[in-house]
Amino acid sequence: MKVSLFVTCLVDMFQTNVGKATVEVLERLGCEVDFPEGQICCGQPAYNSGYVTDAKKAMKRMIAAFEEAEYVVSPSGSCTTMFREYPHLFQDDPKWAAKAQQLADKTYELTDFIVNVLGVEDVGAVLHKKATVHTSCHMTRLLGVSEEPMKLLRHVKGLELTALPGKHQCCGFGGTFSVKMAQISEQMVDEKVACVEDTEAEVLIGADCGCLMNIGGRLDRKDKNVRVMHIAEVLNSR
């Protein structure tokens, strides 16, 4: 099965280890992974900030970059959600709406792809740690992917999972929200960090790098000894 990696900006610039882990997990599961070099930002930050024309230019470039892909897989629920929104955003342009629909139909968040396309729940991962899981807003509420990460994590040998209080509460990142509403964002992430502390977990696991960078940064500033891991890294642990 051929898979094209939609790496996302945050992974490309800040969390390259997540991209590497994603590729290694997919290849171990029998996928042939390529990286379309024409990919750029999905346009979400520009669109959410009101720069619709600029955002659509980026969207068209992304549609073209992945036009020949059999499947598109991303280690981000947020950016995958943006791809799924493309058809609606091009509804007044039939030509691009059709192309956008083709892309949306073949694009999957990593855990969704592994569980629902490959039909795998045990990837053979091993991690002897006590962990808690942060569920990101876009992935659960907009993309509708919530059970898939847990199905995979329950099969990780040695991993002790403990429930995160207020797990559906936003961490305060929200892309540009954390910049535009910094004081509110800080209060939200402080609440999230307090919840993580309550679990006494050694590891915080999540599926969106934005959330993990936000929570992880706050944990570091508070000198909390909690390791932050993307789920791709967990699934790639041996």
From Swiss-Prot:
Cellular component terms per the entry's GO annotation: cytosol
GO terms classed as biological process: lactate metabolic process
GO molecular function per UniProt: oxidoreductase activity
Pfam short name (any one): CCG
Top-level lineage group: Bacteria
Function noted in UniProt: Is involved in L-lactate degradation and allows cells to grow with lactate as the sole carbon source.
Classification via HAMAP family: LutA
Family assignment from sequence similarity: Belongs to the LutA/YkgE family.
The name this protein goes by in its record: Lactate utilization protein A
Gene: lutA
